[in-house]
Structures are given as structure tokens and as C-alpha cells.
């Protein structure tokens, strides 16, 4: 059911036809590296893997912790998004795909859906961020926005209800963050 089984079939097909694949290593800062002439940029460039498949970096070494009990496949694919922080000199950029801020109190174990607060705590302040999940209802909670304090927020809208008014209010209200 849903997107994940089809994606897994696609990934397996791709691997069987020569595509090199590897697991996203939560906490790593060495998985994505510069290929051409990296030495001059070694101290100024980093991509840190913050979260993926139900795990969030702890902020220490390459250690991560699981965000929810049970099978991560029980949640939709959005909850399994990968999140990164890119640093280049003083510029920092955050992208968390479709991660959630857990703004669904009526759902069972809603607290397990709040990846944003934990990711925000380890990410820290950024210059630019991409709004999680197109700025939908369950994203960009106040704790997350305060932790990142971005100067610019990019919203990748793909339908007429992206972003939603409540998320825009959180993003634009200086009293929220």
C-alpha cells in the first residue's frame, strides 16, 4: 500500500541493472563529499545527514536514535524522508523532504510523528531552509522554526493547498520564532 512498496521495487530493479546504491547514514558527514578539488574546501564544506527512515542524529559523532516504536514502514513515506544540513563557509541550508512536525494531536502516538523538533535541535540555525512537506498542516512547528531561525524559507508548492494558512502564519509571525 502506498508509495514505499513501489519505490522499493524500483530501487531493486535499478540495483539489478547497474545502479550503485547505499544506505543513507544518519549522522554521517562523509557520505556526500565534493568530487572535484575538495582540499581547498575541506574546512568550509560539509553535508551532515540529520534524519532518515525513523532515525534522527543525536548531535554526537555518527550516533542516531529511533524516533518511534515499531516498524517505520507503518508510517507513510513522508515520515521516512531524509534530512540534510549543508554548510559552505557561513552559509547553511536545511532540506528535510516531507518530514513532519507532529501537529496531529488526534492521532495515536502523535509525538512520534514530531521529527521536526528533534531535527531542529541537532541542525541549529541556518541561512536558508526548504519548508518540510510543502508547508502542509503538520510542518514547521514553532520549536523547529525557532531552532533553525532561517533568513529565507523556500516552499515547494505542488498543489493549490500548499502551503496552508496555519503554516504560513507560523512561518511569518515573529512571536512564534
Provide a role label for each language-model segment:
Residues 1-109, 113-114, 173-177:
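Flexible, acidic/histidine-containing loops and adjacent segments that form or flank the divalent-metal
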Residues 1-2, 75-79, 104-177:
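Cap/insert and terminal regions of metallo-dependent hydrolase folds
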Amino acid at each position: 500500500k502506498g508509495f514505499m512498496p513501489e519505490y522499493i521495487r524500483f530501487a531493486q530493479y535499478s540495483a539489478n541493472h547497474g545502479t550503485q546504491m547505499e544506505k543513507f547514514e544518519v549522522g554521517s558527514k562523509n557520505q556526500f563529499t565534493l568530487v572535484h578539488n575538495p582540499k581547498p574546501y575541506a574546512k568550509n564544506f560539509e553535508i551532515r545527514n540529520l534524519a532518515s527512515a525513523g532515525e534522527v542524529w543525536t548531535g554526537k559523532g555518527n550516533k542516531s536514535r529511533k524516533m518511534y516504536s515499531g516498524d517505520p514502514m507503518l508510517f507513510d513515506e513522508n515520515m521516512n524522508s531524509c534530512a540534510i544540513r549543508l554548510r559552505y563557509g557561513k552559509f547553511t541550508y536545511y532540506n528535510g523532504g516531507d518530514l513532519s512536525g507532529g501537529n496531529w494531536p488526534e492521532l495515536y502516538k502523535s509525538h512520534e510523528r514530531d521529527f521536526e523538533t528533534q531535527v531542529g535541535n541537532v541542525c541549529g540555525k541556518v541561512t536558508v531552509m526548504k519548508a518540510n512537506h510543502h508547508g502542509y498542516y503538520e510542518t514547521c512547528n514553532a520549536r523547529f522554526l525557532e531552532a533553525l531561525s532561517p533568513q529565507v524559507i523556500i516552499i515547494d508548492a505542488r498543489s493549490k493547498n500548499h502551503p496552508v494558512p496555519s503554516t504560513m502564519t507560523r512561518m511569518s509571525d515573529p512571536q512564534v520564532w
